[in-house]
């Protein structure tokens, strides 16, 4: 018999039903479960797939550059970044008819185009790109890197080039390589690019390979470095009247500590950014020489962890046994990586709007909103994934003997206390926050708004004041104009920083009040509940009171029959599945809050947010309903306008989202009967009965249907909000 899909599981390949196809797709990347897998092949497959991932990333970014160079308006945007709308790419078939063609022909284009809300124009402009030729060069270079990555992936699967398991488990060498080689050297290289290309570019000098060695980024070159006069590199920075991209008002400094924002571009000073990357490079280059490899000097990770035994024995044996546990579990390593990456991604969202690094991006409001929302959603999915792989670690890789009485074992031992504390925090936050919102709703409804319970966030305001915000009148630490820290800040460190905090034109330390207090606690409720579900799922993955032998059933089992008091919904997979809904819910509140607060800030009517955000009806009426009107008018009796694509996506997103419920609120029996009926009709219909299928159609398993439902729910939810966000922001600000 010919080999059938999936080749990696002969048991599954012989399944006579359509389960073969769906289970095959579901387990295609679960290399550990494949036939004939060895530890060596497992590591090699994952290693090779990393190169494939890199190839896809380089190809995608190459495509961005290529399409903007081919169909965009980068060169005309560079001449006037605040008034020309950046074009992402052309639209081949605008829907529908001539009105759509006219509506989407904008940004100085000859035909219908999409506007770019990704910030790539601002990014490329800031780092020194100026012409379409620059963009084409970048696209070709990334295409070349993509090809190299594919070749490297293939090469490392060939017998002579396969790394051994010991190579993959050499933690110290990997740490040194990643810290020094990846973070250190790349940060140093980026500092070099900023100093040699981007900073001269911001001062009107066009540096490329042909004049790279002739243009000194600093008049005295490397002289001050070798004579120890490093402070010279910070002298004569760009003036506050500097026009970005020209020599007007430009200085000569390359590494500064100015603080605050460039007055024209509203972004961080490029010379501050270069200084930051140089400092990061130094720290990581040092860090990458700390671990013991060939020369017998430096730290051994195992020795470090074995020595981590807390005094007094209150945490048992501390980190004993952790080295081998982590080093032998790819799920543990992936969980750690995802947790770190998730936090970093959320930090990127927070910092991209509050400390914009790219020239003029702060004045492109739709891009600001899109990037914040994009990075928060990405962070949510990555963070939930960390707990999923943490749970798989406990089921597949955790060895109780190896971890006796260490911090891991102790987490499992007192999991009841962890869950009950999280549960208490979630209940407290939920009932109190909802109680305040609903009370305020009722007061508004009865015409007595003065009876609302409005709580000033005095502690948060005090923290903002301590960092230099003066408007609250606390007169404490950096907001106290006669304190030593304040006076030092005037001259020594970041003199522009305190000015930036107290300007009302940016997103630093926004003024907060009772509406912020309430939504902050609503978000805290979402975070604590999501965490509770995820932590419970991971800590109960091996067993719970109801099902002590849970680990024998694997990560994602549907049920274990009626005899266990109802064991549906208690696999670690179910916890992940439920947590994703809460994660989406929480990020909904986060993005609603961010967007509404910023819309009112940008429009100059912050009182709308302050007055309407203290009760639920205010959010529904003055944020959601009021801002969806432009969107819904994308198509109207008078024809099509440029928001029509978002109106269509808004409707389509709702459709996808609603489709999810067909899979989420349903029973397998219903689907099985429907399938049997359709198959019966098919087999008895002339012509149709000439086509036979090899596999007997069966309904999806409970877990599979939940996954399909969850995917539709998530995608529809994000599509709907993305359309709302972009249309409501671009409809107001262009």
From Swiss-Prot:
The keyword Iron-sulfur applies. Keywords: 4Fe-4S, Chlorophyll, Chloroplast, Chromophore, Electron transport, Iron, Iron-sulfur, Magnesium, Membrane, Metal-binding, Oxidoreductase, Photosynthesis, Photosystem I, Plastid, Thylakoid, Transmembrane, Transmembrane helix, Transport. [4Fe-4S] cluster binds at residues 559, 568. One of its GO terms (molecular function) is oxidoreductase activity. Chlorophyll a B3 binds at residues 662, 670. It is found in: Plastid, Chloroplast thylakoid membrane. One of its GO terms (cellular component) is photosystem I. P700 is a chlorophyll a/chlorophyll a' dimer, A0 is one or more chlorophyll a, A1 is one or both phylloquinones and FX is a shared 4Fe-4S iron-sulfur center. PsaA and PsaB bind P700, the primary electron donor of photosystem I (PSI), as well as the electron acceptors A0, A1 and FX. PSI is a plastocyanin-ferredoxin oxidoreductase, converting photonic excitation into a charge separation, which transfers an electron from the donor P700 chlorophyll pair to the spectroscopically characterized acceptors A0, A1, FX, FA and FB in turn. Oxidized P700 is reduced on the lumenal side of the thylakoid membrane by plastocyanin. Belongs to the PsaA/PsaB family. This is Photosystem I P700 chlorophyll a apoprotein A2.
């Amino acid at each position: 018999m010919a080999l059938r899909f999936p080749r990696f599981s002969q048991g599954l390949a012989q399944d006579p039903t359509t389960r073969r196809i769906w289970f095959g797709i579901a387990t295609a990347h679960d290399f550990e479960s494949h036939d004939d897998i060895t530890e060596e092949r497992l590591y090699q497959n994952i290693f090779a797939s990393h190169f494939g991932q890199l190839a896809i990333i380089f190809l995608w970014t190459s495509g961005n550059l290529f399409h903007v160079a081919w169909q965009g308006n980068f060169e005309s945007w560079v001449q006037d970044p605040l008034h020309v709308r950046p074009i992402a790419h052309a639209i081949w078939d605008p829907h529908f008819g001539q009105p759509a063609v006219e509506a989407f022909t904008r940004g100085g284009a000859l035909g219908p185009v999409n506007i770019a809300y990704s910030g790539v124009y601002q990014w490329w402009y800031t780092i020194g790109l100026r012409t379409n030729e620059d963009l084409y060069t970048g696209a070709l270079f990334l295409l070349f890197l993509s090809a190299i990555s594919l070749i490297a992936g293939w090469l490392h699967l060939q017998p002579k080039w396969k790394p051994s398991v010991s190579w993959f488990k050499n933690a110290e060498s990997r740490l040194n390589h990643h810290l020094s080689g990846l973070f250190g050297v790349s940060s140093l290289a980026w500092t070099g690019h900023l100093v040699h290309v981007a900073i001269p570019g911001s001062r009107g000098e066009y540096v490329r390979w042909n004049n790279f060695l002739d243009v000194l980024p600093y008049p005295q070159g490397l002289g001050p470095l070798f004579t120890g006069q490093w402070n010279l590199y910070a002298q004569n920075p760009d003036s506050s009247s500097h026009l970005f991209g020209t020599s007007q008002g430009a200085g000569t400094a390359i590494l500064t500590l100015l603080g605050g924002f460039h007055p024209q571009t509203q972004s961080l000073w490029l010379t501050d950014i270069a200084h930051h990357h140089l400092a990061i490079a130094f720290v990581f280059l040092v860090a990458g020489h700390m671990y013991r490899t060939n020369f017998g000097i430096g730290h051994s990770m195992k020795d470090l962890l074995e020595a981590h035994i807390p005094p007094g024995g209150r945490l048992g044996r501390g980190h004993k046994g952790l080295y081998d546990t982590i080093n032998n579990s790819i799920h543990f390593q992936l969980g750690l990586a995802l947790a770190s990456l998730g936090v970093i991604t959320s930090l990127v969202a927070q910092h991209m709007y509050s400390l914009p690094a790219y020239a003029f991006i702060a004045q492109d409001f739709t891009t600001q909103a899109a990037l914040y929302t994009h990075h928060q959603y990405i962070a949510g999915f990555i963070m939930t994934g960390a707990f999923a792989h943490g749970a798989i670690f406990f089921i597949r890789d955790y060895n109780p003997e190896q971890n006796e009485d260490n911090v891991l074992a102790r987490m499992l031992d007192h999991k009841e206390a962890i869950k009950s504390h999280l549960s208490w925090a979630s209940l407290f936050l939920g009932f109190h926050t909802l109680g305040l919102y609903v009370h305020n709703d009722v007061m508004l409804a009865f015409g007595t708004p003065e009876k609302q319970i409005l709580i000033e966030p005095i502690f948060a305001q005090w923290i903002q004041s301590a960092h230099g915000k003066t408007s609250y009148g606390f007169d404490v630490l950096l907001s106290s104009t006669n304190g030593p820290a304040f006076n030092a800040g005037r001259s020594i460190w970041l003199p522009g920083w305190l000015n930036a905090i107290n300007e009302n034109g940016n997103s630093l330390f926004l003024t907060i009040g009772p509406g912020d207090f309430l939504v902050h606690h609503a978000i805290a409720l979402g975070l604590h509940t999501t965490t509770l579900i995820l932590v419970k799922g991971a800590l109960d993955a091996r067993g719970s009171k109801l099902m002590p032998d849970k680990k024998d059933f694997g990560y994602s089992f549907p049920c274990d029959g009626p005899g266990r008091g109802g064991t549906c919904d208690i696999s670690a997979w179910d916890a992940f599945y439920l947590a994703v809904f809460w994660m989406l819910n929480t990020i909904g509140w986060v993005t609603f809050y961010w967007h509404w607060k910023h819309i009112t800030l940008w429009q100059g009517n912050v009182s709308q947010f302050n007055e309407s955000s203290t009760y639920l009806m205010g959010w529904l009426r003055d944020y959601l309903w009021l801002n969806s009107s432009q969107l819904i008018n994308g198509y109207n009796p008078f024809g099509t306008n440029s928001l029509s694509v978002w109106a269509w996506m808004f409707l389509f997103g709702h459709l996808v989202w609603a489709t999810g419920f067909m899979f989420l609120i349903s029973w397998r029996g219903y689907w099985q009967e429907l399938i049997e009926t359709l198959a019966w009709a098919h087999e008895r219909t002339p012509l149709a009965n000439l086509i036979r299928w090899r596999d007997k159609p069966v309904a999806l398993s409970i877990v599979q249907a939940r996954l399909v439902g969850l995917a539709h729910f998530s995608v529809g939810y994000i599509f709907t909000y993305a359309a709302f966000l972009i249309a409501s922001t671009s409809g107001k600000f262009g």
